[in-house]
């Protein structure tokens, strides 16, 4: 049974709206590390400026894309529910707190050119912080789904359920994937810099047949 009273209706709508607002703010703040780029007259071209800050720029676009996919997954999961109980609330709050912290981890990771494209070099732990945050976001989504499946009264009665290896292990695979990149970054930033490429291919393996949504990460 669900833990505590199930809050539905307007209370549930407000939780979803609150979550969407925090994601919108966090994903906008991601651009701040590169918002102040400028060209000193006679000193550099626009391409040189972009090249000098390629780490921050690549990190911004990748993180923007990943957060968008994570929000899409979160939105799909929450839309399948009719309300929330205590565990759902706190897991969602944890999810939001890490989303809100991502601009910090993204800025630290982007400052190091070692993070992307086989650049090599020392990440100083910023890779572990960045990818560990991604893993925690996926973990919270996975735990929300796991709790809801154990408490079917949280679901809308007309929602279809899928019981395949993809639905059981997809979330854990993403958690392991993100965490693995972080661990590898501690020892070999060059190897870990190619890890993000997997994010574009994992959905081809892990999405349910017939699913039209790309990059589900629950």
Task: Explain the meaning of each model-derived region.
Residues 1-218:
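Multi-pass alpha-helical transmembrane bundle typical of ion/small-solute transporters
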């Amino acid at each position: 049974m669900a833990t505590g009273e199930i809050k539905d209706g307007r209370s549930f709508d407000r939780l979803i709206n609150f979550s969407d607002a925090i994601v919108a703010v966090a994903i906008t703040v991601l651009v701040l590390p590169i918002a102040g780029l400028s060209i000193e007259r006679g000193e550099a071209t626009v391409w040189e400026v972009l090249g000098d800050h390629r780490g921050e720029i690549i990190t911004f676009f990748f993180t923007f894309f990943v957060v968008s996919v994570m929000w899409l997954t979160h939105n799909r999961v929450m839309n399948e529910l009719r309300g929330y109980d205590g565990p759902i609330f706190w897991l969602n709050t944890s999810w939001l707190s890490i989303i809100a912290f991502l601009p910090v981890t993204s800025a630290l990771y982007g400052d190091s050119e070692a993070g992307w494209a086989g650049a090599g070099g020392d990440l100083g732990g910023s890779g572990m912080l960045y990818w560990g945050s991604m893993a925690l976001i996926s973990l919270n989504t996975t735990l929300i789904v796991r709790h809801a499946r154990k408490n079917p009264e949280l679901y809308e009665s007309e929602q279809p359920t899928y019981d395949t290896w993809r639905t059981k292990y997809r979330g854990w695979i993403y958690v392991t994937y993100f965490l693995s990149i972080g661990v590898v970054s501690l020892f070999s930033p060059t190897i870990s810099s190619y890890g993000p490429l997997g994010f574009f291919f994992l959905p081809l393996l892990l999405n349910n047949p017939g699913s039209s949504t790309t990059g589900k990460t629950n």
